[in-house]
Amino acid sequence: MSVHIEAKQGEIAESILLPGDPLRAKYIAETFLEDVTCYNNVRGMLGFTGTYKGKRVSVQGTGMGVPSISIYVNELIQSYGVKNLIRVGTCGAIQKDVKVRDVIIAMTACTDSNMNRLTFPGFDFAPAANFDLLKKAYDAGTEKGLHVRVGNVLTADVFYRESMDIVKKLGDYGVLAVEMETTALYTLAAKYGVNALSVLTVSDHIFTGEETTSEERQTTFNEMIEIALDAAIQQ
């Protein structure tokens, strides 16, 4: 048991999916996994373990933003020995040719968070995905005939931003989309020597206004989830 996770040792698999929304964790467990058990309900942040295609896998809600995901990733790695962590979530497109419902696999993440600047004063640490996980996820997506993009994303600390000028400039430099957690996940994975990946579905476009409903975000992004699960069970 850790501070925010009440699981006993052995109840969490070495490979885990990390949705921000605990209701999405429940949806993934009920829709994709077999022989499911719920190991966590602390603060309503649900966690489940089951099997997918005969392989053991867990799914844990993390909440939104760098501080929240950092809590769960730290505890999953240090207290429960998790080795493969795959964030599954939504993002807002920045590039004109990135469309709603496209799948983005984050190769790396830039950020306006001070998390890494506190650890590396005067430096900008460049957190990156694990290549093996990335390739497996990319191959799984292309085999399904999906439009999968691989590249840089922005991990933002601010959801309601007063000006989008900096986001537009990052788009000019090739950043694909904006979300709120990947930098933290990749940095902590690097710190502890484990594998991490973010697989994201585009829920809206920052500049065109195209978007999906909140219900669709919870229940219909099955392709993203399948890609992540297929990558997880190959590790």
From Swiss-Prot:
GO terms for molecular function: purine-nucleoside phosphorylase activity. Phosphate binds at residues 20, 24, 43, 87-90. The keyword Transferase applies. It comes from Bacillus cereus (strain ATCC 14579 / DSM 31 / CCUG 7414 / JCM 2152 / NBRC 15305 / NCIMB 9373 / NCTC 2599 / NRRL B-3711). The keyword Transferase applies. Belongs to the PNP/UDP phosphorylase family. It comes from the Bacteria. Keywords: Glycosyltransferase, Transferase. Its EC number is 2.4.2.1. It catalyses: a purine D-ribonucleoside + phosphate = a purine nucleobase + alpha-D-ribose 1-phosphate; a purine 2'-deoxy-D-ribonucleoside + phosphate = a purine nucleobase + 2-deoxy-alpha-D-ribose 1-phosphate. Homohexamer; trimer of homodimers. A purine D-ribonucleoside binds at residues 4, 162, 179-181, 203-204. One of its GO terms (biological process) is purine nucleoside catabolic process. The active site is at residue 204. One of its GO terms (cellular component) is cytosol. The record marks 217 as: Important for catalytic activity. Catalyzes the reversible phosphorolytic breakdown of the N-glycosidic bond in the beta-(deoxy)ribonucleoside molecules, with the formation of the corresponding free purine bases and pentose-1-phosphate. This is Purine nucleoside phosphorylase DeoD-type.
